[in-house]
């Protein structure tokens, strides 16, 4: 094997390892989120832990033709400028024939609090930026860890979810 072939093979091998590690890291984080939120499959448990429907947000979020989100049970005490992978600010419950089922978690930072930090970049979690919901004035990121979302784990709207 000549030197150039050996060098190219080495670079390809290193890139493959980096990609595998990155994918494993992301999957590992999703597994951590699932373990941390498994206790909240019942809304009663979420309520006991401080998550609840909030005035004005106490309905099923639906975007006809795009998908739904469901009902957001929010821990108002957790709304600050920090996000914690294992303690999401909201549990998102989806309607089902058997009642509400945990479908996703949501990370939330109020825009006014984030702006007060002086940061010019949106907040981040796991190397990804939260995005601004201009209607609600919050930075958000959904993680569909309990209900498959064919559009992606991190997408807001899930075409597999609809509101009654």
Locations of the language-model features?
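Positively charged n-region of N-terminal signal peptides that target proteins for export
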Residues: 1-4
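Bacterial N-terminal signal peptides
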Residues: 10-18
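Primary mode marks residue(s) on the alpha4-beta5-alpha5 output face of response regulator receiver
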Residues: 25-164
